[in-house]
Amino acid sequence: MAPPYHGDTREFSMAPAKKIKAKIKKTLPVTGPQAPTVSELMHWYCMNTNTHGCRRIVVSRGRLRKFIWILLTLSAVGLILWQCAELIMSYYTASVSVTVQFQKLPFPAVTICNINPYKYSAMKEHLSELDKETKNALETLYGFSEGKSKVRRDAADWNSTGRNMQSKLLEKIPLLKFDDLFKKTATEILSGHKRKIEGSAFHQGSSMVNIGEPQDVVGFQLCDPNNSSDCAVYIFSSGVNAIQEWYKLHYMNIMAQIPLEMKVNMGYSAEDLLLTCFFDGISCDSRNFTPFHHPLYGNCYTFNSGENGTILTTSTGGSEYGLQVVLYVEEADYNPFLVTSTGAKIIVHDQDEYPFIEDIGTEIETAMATSIGMHFTRSHKLSQPYSDCTETGNDIPVANLYNKSYSLQICLHSCFQRAMVDTCGCAQYAQPLPPGAEYCNYKKYPNWMYCYYKLHEKFVKEQLGCQQICKESCSFKEWTLTTSLAQWPSSVSEDWMLRVLSWDKRQKINKMLNKTDLANLVVFYKDLNERFISENPANNLVILLSNFGGQLGLWMSCSMVCVIEIIEVFFIDSFSIVMRRRWQKMKKWWNDRKAPRPQEPPQVNAPAKEGHDNPVCTDEDLPTFNTALRLPLPQENHMPRTPPPNYSTLQLNAAFTDQLPDTLEGRSH
């Protein structure tokens, strides 16, 4: 009997199924996209992904550790989604970042106007009737007259003296004392007649001198000549304001009928307004100023207008290197009803900008030295979609009536003037004249006052549409002004300075100038640094992708490759597996329905189809570890522990065959 076989017994000690699995595992690796189920695919992904959290969920031992890693991973995913949502919202909010730079700059344009637009001595002829009626109204209201005591008259005296003082102008627009605003009753100041007030009341209040009791208000009523019930009532808590407003209405009507050449001659010349001039330490004169006629301020003059193509610059900052002028305003020739203050008005602006001195001008006092220090800021805003601004104004459906570059104020004034022409048939005096239009006056347009006030009311309430149409300019320049005052001239230098200035003015010594007629003005840069403010997009596509990458790397140690891997596994491969399984099921169902197989006798304990007999694992699929595990197992035949005998070795040679019987016979004996 042969000895037992002592080879490697480890292979025979393993179960047949485990041996096959171990053998296949060495030759067929597991590939994720070929996994038969999504759960196996997810297991493969967690074991092979670069995101550490997912791998730790699979390889961690113990439920607590797995739970902690699941919680951390989900928290990181939640933070990523939150931060990415914030980045996307920030990207679409069109926010901007601001850049500030400093550099040197040229000197701006400086426009100077006398507060009194025209010499009263030259205007008396045109304003004689208006001035007379204004004095009559003051005498009736306050008992005011030159050389008489200023005692206010009672209402009882109006019937006896007021009727004789009515005028043509006051008959059209009488001044009224409102007794009860709620009952809408008023009394005419001159006649004392009671009247019922029609229309809406618009309060133009003031804290100045009140007329009588606090409840007393004064105003006037403007009505449509074609419809007496359609009226607008303007009330004032001060008789001073009421008379001034009434005076300005008639004043604009008169000035609109005077030719421009005549108005220029009635205004102040550059030689009249300017006494001395210095710029950057160098003497200058009226030839350095460009004349400019303003509808409300008469003759104005612009220094460094750039009209000749040259813009002056200053060598350094400080008051000694700026513009220094002494102005002569001639207070004695002021219109007493039109203006109630003395001095000049200036505005600092760019050479391409229109000087809206009535809106943003700075007033200069007489008998004072006014120093104005400047800081210059140039700004540029981004247009759509970052802000609602315009680059050139060409996209605004409003014609520019000013011969200057676009600005929001130009657009608003042009829009109102165009609405005035379209609605009232004439143009308002304080603004440029549109092509083909003419200024309003009583004779040709008797309804213009009522129309103007009603239109202005809509404009203030933003019902005219101008505020919705006009946009801010994307590029604009701004000068921040700092004003300081000092008494000028001083008491010790007043005598000789006024004598010298009078001599320069070519006046006689016995008609020496008064310091209340003079104003000293200095305009200078505090420093020569320009502050440039520009807007740049705070978010763009590159920044968005960078922020996404930063969030993924911060919270999950994940790069763009990881993102592609996630897209491939969770979207492409998972979808492919699900669709492949559904397709195989649909295909099998269709084949079974189309060509049913013949019935076979039922088999008892028939083994389930596995491996390549399974329709899920067809020949189209590449062999994997999972599909190999489904191959049919071999029959379990017990193998001998010793090799079978070699029967051919038991055959005897022929030489011994003949001896065999003898041997057998000998043993038998």
UniProtKB/Swiss-Prot annotation:
Residues in the Extracellular compartment per record: 89-551
Keywords: Cell membrane, Disulfide bond, Ion channel, Ion transport, Membrane, Sodium, Sodium channel, Sodium transport, Transmembrane, Transmembrane helix, Transport
GO molecular function: ligand-gated sodium channel activity; WW domain binding
Reactions catalysed, as given in the entry: Na(+)(in) = Na(+)(out)
Segments crossing the lipid bilayer: 68-88, 552-572
Pfam families the record matches: ASC (PF00858)
InterPro entries named among the record's database cross-references: ENaC, ENaC_chordates, ENaC_CS
Gene Ontology biological process: cellular response to acidic pH; cellular response to aldosterone; intracellular sodium ion homeostasis; multicellular organismal-level water homeostasis; sodium ion import across plasma membrane; sodium ion transmembrane transport
Regulation of its activity: Originally identified and characterized by its inhibition by the diuretic drug amiloride.
Start and end residues of each stretch annotated as Disordered: 592-619
Membrane association type: Multi-pass membrane protein
Keyword Transport set for record: yes
Topology Cytoplasmic: residue spans: 1-67, 573-669
Gene Ontology cellular component list: apical plasma membrane; external side of plasma membrane; extracellular exosome; nucleoplasm; sodium channel complex
Top-rank taxon, per record: Eukaryota
Residue pairs linked by disulfide bridges in the UniProt entry: 113-300, 223-231, 277-284, 389-474, 411-470, 415-466, 424-451, 426-440
Places the protein is found: Apical cell membrane
Function: This is one of the three pore-forming subunits of the heterotrimeric epithelial sodium channel (ENaC), a critical regulator of sodium balance and fluid homeostasis. ENaC operates in epithelial tissues, where it mediates the electrodiffusion of sodium ions from extracellular fluid through the apical membrane of cells, with water following osmotically.
Subunit structure: Component of the heterotrimeric epithelial sodium channel (ENaC) composed of an alpha/SCNN1A, a beta/SCNN1B and a gamma/SCNN1G subunit.
Family indicated by similarity: Belongs to the amiloride-sensitive sodium channel (TC 1.A.6) family. SCNN1G subfamily.
Protein name: Epithelial sodium channel subunit gamma
Primary gene name: SCNN1G
